[in-house]
């Protein structure tokens, strides 16, 4: 009897050793990332602005009135562009020295990027079973998330830029992902999205996802969450809230020069053309409406096909393309996008989606944005103008290809996982 059991015992021990070695590999990857991120104390300009905005609120100074600009050590004078509630939530950073604040925002971003990637993998039901790795599926997906995020942090432009600036785009993305991807949420679905909208209006585009899913409860919850959070901002910063919502919000030009090559959207592309403001605005509205129509068409088709994760990606890319400002570090959504379309491309034997996933990785690793000369964008030749919009072209391709090629046709792989989809209509 013992001789018969011995191979099973040895096999079990071997699997455990393999699992330990895999986590050792993940630890080495995270160690390398930490060395790259913390090997020296970098200056992250956006966390500096967050700190100064929080200090202004704590000191009772205006955040926006009179065209307030905050002076940075590198000579740039920048405004605080978020609602007053954000300054309130940034206040813990105000109590830290700049190096400590840089470390804090970097650690927070890294943890949330791993967590959000693991949630995306769970929503896709990636790696559901394994004969070699004796661990729950959630731990396997967490390990896989670490192995995905580690190189992305260093080598993929939107992700590395987000870390370099000390931005909160990953925080906002995580708030959306935890509301839209899981099958169930421990809070009323839409609550986290509403908080994200209160921190920065751009996540409001994800209301379209709930509306097309006919999940009115989640949409109303998001609106209620946004209203309560904004009201809290008025309670804690009445003058700044009034100034922001009645005046500052409408002046998108204060965010930065739209013609910069890193502004990856329709508005940025039009700003690089020598046309008048009225013509530029009309073209932006027309282009945005066309992209909206294409996105709704694509989302309806992929939702009918039972792929809500892809619908979330479509609306995320739509928001980036039509937003008045979409700096390249706002495009952190490209990471979950390549994961979703890559895995769905494999499951559905959809070569177009798989190739778009690969193209997305290539664009992030060797970005053509730099082919558009910085600060000389408006005089660049036509092919540089086109190449400099690479993220926009890729996003539009994903939306169109998703709508054209993802159908309700069942495959063996998909039939096994049809119940594992995010955001059911009832929370």
Curated annotation (Swiss-Prot):
Its EC number is 2.4.1.-. Its main location: membrane. The lineage of its organism: Bacteria, Bacillati, Actinomycetota, Actinomycetes, Mycobacteriales. It is a multi-pass membrane protein. This is Polyprenol-phosphate-mannose-dependent alpha-(1-2)-phosphatidylinositol mannoside mannosyltransferase. The keyword Lipid metabolism applies. Belongs to the glycosyltransferase 87 family. Keywords: Cell membrane, Glycosyltransferase, Lipid biosynthesis, Lipid metabolism, Membrane, Phospholipid biosynthesis, Phospholipid metabolism, Transferase, Transmembrane, Transmembrane helix, Virulence. The keyword Amino-acid biosynthesis does not apply. The chain crosses the membrane at residues 18-38, 101-121, 143-163, 191-211, 218-238, 279-299, 308-328, 331-346, 351-371, 386-406. It comes from the Bacteria. One of its GO terms (biological process) is phospholipid biosynthetic process. One of its GO terms (cellular component) is plasma membrane. It is an enzyme of class 2 (transferase). Coiled coil: none annotated. It is found in: Cell membrane.
């Amino acid at each position: 009897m013992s001789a018969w059991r011995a191979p099973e015992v040895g096999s079990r021990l071997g699997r455990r050793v393999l699992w330990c070695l895999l986590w050792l590999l993940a630890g080495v990857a995270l160690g390398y990332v930490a060395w790259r991120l913390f090997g020296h104390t970098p200056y992250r300009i956006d966390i500096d602005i967050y700190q100064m905005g929080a200090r202004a609120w704590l000191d009772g100074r205006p955040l926006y009135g009179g065209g307030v600009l905050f002076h940075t050590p590198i000579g740039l004078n920048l405004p605080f562009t978020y609602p007053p509630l954000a300054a309130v939530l940034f206040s813990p950073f105000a109590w830290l020295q700049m190096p400590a604040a840089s470390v804090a925002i970097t650690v927070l971003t890294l943890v949330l990027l791993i967590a959000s990637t693991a949630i995306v993998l769970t929503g896709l039901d990636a790696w559901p079973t394994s004969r070699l790795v004796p661990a729950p599926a959630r731990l396997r997906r967490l390990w896989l998330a670490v192995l995905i995020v580690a190189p992305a942090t260093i080598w993929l432009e939107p992700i590395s830029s987000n870390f370099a600036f000390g931005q909160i785009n990953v925080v906002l993305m995580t708030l959306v992902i935890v509301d839209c991807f899981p099958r169930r949420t421990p809070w009323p679905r839409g609550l986290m999205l509403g908080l994200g909208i209160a921190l920065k209006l751009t996540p409001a585009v994800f209301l379209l996802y709930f509306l097309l899913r006919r999940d009115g409860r989640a949409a109303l919850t998001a609106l209620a969450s946004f209203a309560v959070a904004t009201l809290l901002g008025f309670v804690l910063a009445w003058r700044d809230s009034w100034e922001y919502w009645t005046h500052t919000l409408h002046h998108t030009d204060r965010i930065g020069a739209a013609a910069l090559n890193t502004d990856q959207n329709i508005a940025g592309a039009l700003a690089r053309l020598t046309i008048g403001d009225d013509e530029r605005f009309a073209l932006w509205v027309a282009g945005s409406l066309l992209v909206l129509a294409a996105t709704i068409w694509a989302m309806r088709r992929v939702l009918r096909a039972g792929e809500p994760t892809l619908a979330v990606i479509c609306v995320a890319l739509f928001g980036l393309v039509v937003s008045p400002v979409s700096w390249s570090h706002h495009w952190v959504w490209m990471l979950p996008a390549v994961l979703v379309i890559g895995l769905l491309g494999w499951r559905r034997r959809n070569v177009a989606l798989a190739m778009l996933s690969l193209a997305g990785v290539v664009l992030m690793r060797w970005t053509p944005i730099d082919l558009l000369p910085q600060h000389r964008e408006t005089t660049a030749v036509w092919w540089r103008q086109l190449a400099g919009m690479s993220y926009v072209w890729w996003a539009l391709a994903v939306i169109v290809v998703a709508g054209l090629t993802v159908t309700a046709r069942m495959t063996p792989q998909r039939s096994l996982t049809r119940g594992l989809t995010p955001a059911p209509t009832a929370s």
